[in-house]
């Protein structure tokens, strides 16, 4: 975020300078990842507003980043990306109406209405009216970007808190780790004299100098900091002045007249008056957050910026640091955990839940009543839920005081003006703590791993290998190894034991290391899957969704609810339920797409289901992070290592899936019925000329209308192979549960199993 109104002011006053990109040759450029990604996500040449309708992540953004990296390489510029870290301490969100969320919903509803009327281009234009067409949380892109950086040997670091502060440290460091900064104008609030604000990375870049801005506004450097806070930035909102119109000149005049920002807060009447005290407090916190920004030094310590970079040769000692920085940033965590954040092993968002004492749940792209129950009970507040277990794992490796901390949850659907404390995560529950205690049972050494890799003829440590290593009593016995004084040393040991611990925490493996009922279904599905089909994570997600009771063929909201756009087009109620179940299942599988915005039909029906998939996938990824950090910081793994990025990238659930595969499958099934006189193909029609013609026409339709998909016909066949693997898991569950299972032994209800069998019978004659 930039200082409010400053960019336009700089343009008007012609304070933005331009320079050839070749000027930066043979330098190291520090790049503010937040500013860079915001540009990609909102620029007309690279934004993908249809993410609001397809879910997932922008399809072309990684390709665009690669293109920029190649351009920098051609000009001999070495980029160093810095990502934002932990959130600053803040009050809970206000409980009144969320105006931004209401505006977003209005825009999306209007866009869907236009799409329903056949005005697809107008619908896209409508989506651009909200947030410049950006519907992506940058944190969801982090893993994909880090994977790219790792493969291209691009340097990156996650700041402990504010990314700009970390850039300022790298710039001012005596060793000169970077020579220039690419960021927003907000960067000038720190001890930075000039900043590159934009570039095409091929020809020119634009930059601004602080001294020219100070001369133009007639402010000192300290006054400019106050000016930036009062005008509004990522650290503070704009001061609520009586005047209805905001302008940069008015704010600068006030600071100049009153000499300082705090004097402005104390002497200028604010509207409404009762909020003046709160704004003054937030002003002070924002000012101290800049002046005493916490940064991670090259020695691995998290310290205030002035203690390592003395501004303007001023004398500065540790005694000058305020004693209440915890009220501005967060309670202190070990430097080792800051370092794990820095290297990307654990996301700042996850640790931020614990340090801030808050989880703020944002609304999905399309929600249902079932989703509210799911995100509350299954994902967050249940004693065995992923988020609850994640927080318990982190608290377990920190000082005991952290276990006494209350973690409040604020949902987007909370009633307006509800109690500020809200719901909470019961991470100290006895059931949750029992799961944490069982993690230390997994200490399988490298020798056993190598034996298992040879036995399974595999070269990869993954979910399939780990669940397969428990397929018999003899194999299970090998995984019981007394800990003794051993620690897990190699990367593969850490990854494999993290996977096993995860599987036990999620109930796929029992305490005796044998498969649980749901673990047997997972293993059965893996045994019939091709390695190249990449079904491991989707099958796991399917089983989790089945256990949560949200994967079925019924309409959202019940049988009497109105159908959503993009659902089944033909057939009676049972046939439509079958199509819904098939398209939902297949939509969990990632589609191999081209590096361009989505081209093809859209589906509200699948977008609603995608909210469940993404919510689950992200929470499981966060749980994996907590499991791996718990393994290392509890002393079970070697702590002094340099392969954190390799560990991070070896764990599952790196990215989010969109609705594309479900749309592809649904479109084929609809087209087949359409060309078969609006009727599905039955077993009696298999091999007839009419049935074969209908399938050929449907395949032709797929090839012509899904140009953003690589090899759509082959992908369609892969999707139906995935359905076959899911059916193996379903039948395994049905067999293991028996005809009349007890509630504790029930993963999926008999009615849902019957839905799958009916859908499979309906689908077989329809397949290509």
Curated annotation (Swiss-Prot):
Major subcellular site: cytoplasm
An individual GO BP term: regulation of translation
Keyword Cytoplasm: yes
Gene Ontology MF: a single term: nuclease activity
Complex formation: Interacts with PBP1.
Function: Involved in 3'-UTR mediated RNA regulation. Complexes with PBP1 to promote mRNA interactions with poly(A)-binding protein.
Protein name in the entry: Post-transcriptional regulator MKT1
Species: Cryptococcus neoformans var. grubii serotype A (strain H99 / ATCC 208821 / CBS 10515 / FGSC 9487) (Filobasidiella neoformans var. grubii)
Phylogenetic lineage: Eukaryota, Fungi, Dikarya, Basidiomycota, Agaricomycotina
Gene label: MKT1
């Amino acid at each position: 975020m930039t200082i409010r109104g400053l960019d336009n002011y700089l343009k008007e006053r012609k304070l933005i300078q331009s320079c050839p990109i070749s000027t930066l040759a043979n330098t190291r450029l520090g790049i503010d990842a937040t500013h860079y990604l915001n540009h990609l996500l909102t620029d007309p040449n690279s934004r993908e507003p249809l993410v609001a309708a397809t879910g997932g992540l922008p399809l072309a953004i990684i390709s665009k980043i690669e293109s920029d990296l190649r351009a920098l390489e051609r000009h001999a510029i070495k980029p160093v990306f810095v990502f934002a870290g932990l959130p600053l301490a803040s009050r809970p969100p206000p409980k009144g109406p969320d105006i931004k969320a209401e505006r977003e919903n209005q825009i999306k509803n209007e866009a869907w209405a236009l799409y329903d009327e056949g005005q697809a281009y107008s619908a896209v234009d409508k989506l651009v009216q909200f947030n410049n067409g950006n519907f992506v949380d940058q944190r969801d892109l982090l893993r994909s970007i880090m994977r790219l950086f790792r493969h291209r040997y691009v340097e990156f670091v996650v700041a402990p808190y504010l990314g700009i502060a970390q850039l300022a440290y790298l710039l001012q460091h005596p060793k000169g780790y970077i020579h220039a900064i690419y960021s927003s104008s907000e960067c000038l609030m720190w001890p930075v004299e000039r900043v590159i604000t934009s570039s095409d990375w091929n020809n020119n870049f634009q930059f601004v100098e602080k001294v020219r801005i100070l001369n133009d506004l007639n402010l000192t450097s300290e006054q400019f900091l106050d000016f930036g806070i009062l005008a509004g930035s990522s650290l503070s909102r704009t001061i609520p002045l009586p005047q209805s119109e905001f302008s940069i000149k008015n704010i600068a005049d006030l600071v100049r007249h009153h000499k300082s920002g705090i004097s402005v807060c104390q002497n200028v009447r604010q509207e409404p008056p009762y909020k003046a005290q709160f704004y003054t407090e937030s002003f002070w916190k924002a000012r101290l957050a800049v002046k005493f920004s916490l940064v991670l030094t090259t020695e691995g310590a998290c310290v205030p910026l002035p203690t390592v970079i003395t501004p303007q040769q001023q004398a500065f000692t540790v005694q000058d640091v305020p004693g209440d920085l915890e009220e501005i940033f967060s309670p202190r965590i070990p430097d080792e955990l800051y370092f794990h954040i820095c290297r990307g092993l654990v996301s700042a968002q996850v640790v931020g839940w614990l340090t801030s004492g808050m989880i703020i749940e944002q609304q999905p792209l399309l929600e249902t009543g079932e989703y509210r129950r799911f995100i509350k009970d299954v994902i967050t507040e249940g004693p065995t839920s992923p988020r609850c277990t994640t927080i318990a794992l982190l608290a377990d490796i920190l000082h005991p005081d952290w276990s006494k901390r209350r973690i409040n949850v604020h949902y987007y659907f909370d009633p307006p003006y509800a109690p500020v404390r809200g719901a909470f995560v019961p991470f100290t529950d006895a059931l949750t703590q029992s799961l944490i205690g069982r993690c230390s049972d997994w200490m399988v050494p490298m020798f056993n791993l190598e034996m298992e890799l040879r036995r399974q003829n595999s070269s990869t440590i993954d979910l399939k290998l780990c669940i397969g290593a428990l397929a018999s009593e003899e194999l299970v016995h090998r995984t019981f190894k007394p800990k003794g004084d051993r620690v897990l040393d190699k990367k593969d040991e850490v990854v494999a034991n993290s996977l096993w611990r995860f599987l036990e925490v999620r109930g796929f493996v029992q305490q005796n290391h044998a498969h649980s009922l749901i673990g047997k279904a997972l293993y059965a599905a893996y045994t019939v899957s091709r390695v190249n089909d990449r079904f491991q994570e989707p099958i796991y997600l399917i089983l989790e969704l089945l256990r949560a009771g949200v994967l079925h063929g019924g309409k959202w909201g019940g049988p009497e609810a109105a159908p959503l756009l993009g659902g089944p087009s033909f057939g009676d109620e049972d046939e439509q339920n079958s199509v819904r179940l098939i398209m939902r299942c297949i939509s969990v599988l990632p589609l191999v797409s081209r590096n361009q915005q989505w081209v093809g039909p859209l589906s509200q029906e699948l977008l609603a289901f995608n909210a469940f998939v993404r919510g689950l996938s992200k929470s499981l990824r966060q749980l994996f992070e907590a499991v791996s950090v718990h393994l290392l910081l509890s002393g079970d793994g070697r702590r002094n290592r340099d392969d954190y990025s390799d560990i991070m990238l070896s764990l599952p659930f790196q990215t989010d899936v969109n609705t594309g595969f479900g749309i592809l499958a649904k479109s084929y099934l609809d087209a087949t019925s359409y060309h078969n006189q609006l009727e599905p193909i039955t077993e009696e029609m298999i091999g007839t000329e009419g049935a074969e013609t209908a399938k050929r026409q449907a395949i032709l339709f797929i090839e012509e209308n899904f140009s953003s998909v690589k090899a759509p016909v082959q992908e369609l066949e892969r999707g139906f192979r995935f359905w076959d693997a899911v059916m193996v898991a379903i039948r395994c569950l049905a067999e293991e549960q028996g005809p009349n299972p007890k509630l504790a032994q029930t993963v999926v209800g008999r009615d849902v199993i019957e839905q799958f069998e009916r859908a499979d019978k309906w689908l077989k004659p329809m397949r290509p």
